[in-house]
């Protein structure tokens, strides 16, 4: 089996590419970073530092790479068994034209073998969005063939992959946590889904996507925002602060109550899932900076993201939300000279004040009780 994987960054190499290669799949990475491409093609292997209770180094073998903008990518899409991507939500639209050209070549070559395409992004239904970009790049006469032969499979991914620490001169160096989860919507595959280790199939993907968003992503973000306010440098430092931990755990329990009401998750199993995530945040081998984790506050305070969406759920079901309110207030205090969204958020706050700024970004009613609660908590943190 041969896979073309867009994105040879840390997540591509440390998570999806590694999982595929470990399953015996031939992996060809596509990327624009020539230094990384050259290193992959010279070595055809790389090392991944996997950190859990201990740290160990594992070698990923049998890999190669091509430039994302090359004709090689088009030729590969015409012949491979699977296409995956871990490029970041904003980049999906950029890779769509190359995928479209590859599908045309596959069609024109008489290809009838099913091809499945999977975006492995930290977003809801990312592959469905990629599908729209690909269809937009294709002439309409190809659409029926694509519908028949190409599966666009949504997935939920979960693995903490922090940036490489300063001082490493190896372009392929990557560290990942031992925990990983890759859950795919089995109803969207064309043909028989591949049976690969580490790949889980479900017919209720939305439940698992929201479980991850409302628990890992919610908890990670609130740990970062409260951690920055408390003067902590890393996620580990922050979650070991009893005051931060209490609020983060409380927020995940509040969002968990929404999930239990909405999807019928088992309460005891979900409590264990929350505790597992808290342990992951404590990992001494992961030096995950709170400033990095908190980036893009405009997106993270958006209506469908990790802070506001669970809050809306508590309002829908009449559940407690005091810790989520505290976490959102902390997010409003986030600052970073490195993040354009943080600067944009600071300018909006200064221009219209916290109440109107939160309403504008989150979609919550400006005069609602919950916005007033968040603003009161925000002001109390001054």
From Swiss-Prot:
GO biological process entries: mannitol catabolic process
GO cellular component: cytosol
Protein name, UniProt field: Mannitol-1-phosphate 5-dehydrogenase
GO molecular function: mannitol-1-phosphate 5-dehydrogenase activity
Residues that hold NAD(+) according to the record: 3-14
Top-level taxonomy: Bacteria, Pseudomonadati, Pseudomonadota, Gammaproteobacteria, Enterobacterales
Family from the record: Belongs to the mannitol dehydrogenase family.
Coiled-coil ranges (or none): none
Enzyme type, top EC level: oxidoreductase
Reactions performed catalytically: D-mannitol 1-phosphate + NAD(+) = beta-D-fructose 6-phosphate + NADH + H(+)
HAMAP family: Mannitol_dehydrog
Superkingdom per UniProt: Bacteria
Pfam families assigned to the protein according to its UniProt record, in alphabetical order: Mannitol_dh, Mannitol_dh_C
UniProt keyword list: NAD, Oxidoreductase
Known EC number: 1.1.1.17
NAD keyword on record: yes
């Amino acid at each position: 089996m041969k896979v073309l994987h867009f994105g040879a960054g840390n997540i591509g190499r440390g998570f999806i590419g590694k999982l595929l290669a470990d399953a015996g799949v031939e992996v060809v990475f596509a990327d624009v970073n020539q230094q990384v491409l050259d290193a992959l093609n010279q070595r055809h292997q790389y090392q991944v530092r996997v950190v859990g209770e201990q740290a160990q180094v594992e070698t990923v073998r049998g890999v190669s790479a091509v430039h994302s903008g090359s004709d090689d990518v088009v030729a590969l899409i015409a012949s491979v068994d699977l296409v995956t991507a871990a490029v970041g939500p904003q980049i999906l639209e950029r890779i769509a034209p190359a995928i479209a050209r590859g599908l045309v070549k596959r069609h024109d070559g008489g290809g009838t073998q099913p091809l499945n395409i999977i975006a492995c992004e930290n977003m809801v239904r990312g592959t469905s969005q990629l599908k729209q970009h690909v269809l937009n790049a294709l002439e309409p006469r190809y659409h029926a063939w694509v519908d028949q032969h190409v599966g666009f499979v949504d997935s939920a991914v979960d693995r903490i992959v922090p940036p490489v620490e300063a001082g490493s001169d190896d372009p392929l160096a990557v560290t990942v946590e031992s925990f990983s989860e890759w859950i795919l919507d089995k109803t969207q595959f064309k043909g028989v889904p591949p049976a690969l280790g580490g790949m889980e199939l479900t017919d209720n993907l939305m439940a698992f996507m929201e479980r991850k968003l409302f628990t890992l992503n919610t908890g990670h973000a609130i740990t970062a925002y409260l951690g920055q306010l408390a003067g902590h440098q890393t996620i580990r430092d922050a979650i070991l602060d009893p005051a931060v931990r209490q609020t983060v755990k409380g927020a995940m329990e509040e969002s968990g109550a929404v999930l239990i009401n909405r999807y019928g998750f088992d309460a005891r199993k979900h409590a264990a899932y929350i505790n597992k995530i808290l342990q992951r945040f404590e990992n001494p081998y992961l030096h995950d900076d709170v400033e990095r984790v908190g980036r893009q506050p405009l997106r993270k305070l958006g209506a469908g993201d990790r802070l506001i969406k669970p809050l809306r759920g508590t309002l829908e079901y009449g559940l407690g939300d005091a810790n989520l309110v505290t976490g959102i207030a902390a997010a409003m205090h986030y600052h970073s000279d490195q993040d354009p969204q943080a600067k944009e958020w600071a300018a909006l706050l200064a221009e219209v004040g916290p109440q109107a700024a939160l309403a504008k970004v989150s979609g919550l009613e400006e005069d609602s009780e919950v916005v007033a609660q968040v603003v009161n908590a925000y002001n109390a943190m001054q």
